[in-house]
Amino acid sequence: MNAVVRNGCCEIRGGAGKPRVTLPPMNIDEAILHRDHVAVVLRNGYCQLYNTEGKLVTTYSVNDAKFVRFVGDDQLAIHHRNGRVEIHDFTGRLVRVSA
């Protein structure tokens, strides 16, 4: 599977390359797929986590996200525009902050 962002919309594609799910927000800047979760960074700096069925898992309370990456199987690193990195779990709870 892979996540493809085009014109602010994200499609999760299956193994054959056919679209499986289209995520609802229309202003997506970046999408990262890891196992059964997709983390998206919106153009306004917010970050959301979806499962591969397209259901919203959580919205993170940051408004200046530059990009995200997965840490292990159950945590998400949110990189801010000012260089700070926050590690959150999939429930939205802040685990650790790095400067």
Regions found by a protein language model. Name each.
Residues 1-17:
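An edge-strand/N-cap motif at the start of beta-rich repeat modules
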Residues 4-5, 41, 79:
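Residue-level marker for isolated small/hydroxyl-bearing positions within beta-strands
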Residues 7-11, 44-47, 82-85:
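Loop/turn residues immediately N-terminal
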Residues 15-16, 51-53, 89-91:
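Short loop/turn segments that connect beta-strands within beta-propeller blades
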Residues 18-26, 55-61, 93-98:
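A short beta-strand motif characteristic of beta-propeller blades
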Residues 24-37, 62-74:
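Repeated scaffold domains used in trafficking and secretory/extracellular systems
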Residues 82-99:
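Blade-level signature of beta-propeller repeat domains, shared across WD40, Kelch, NHL, RCC1
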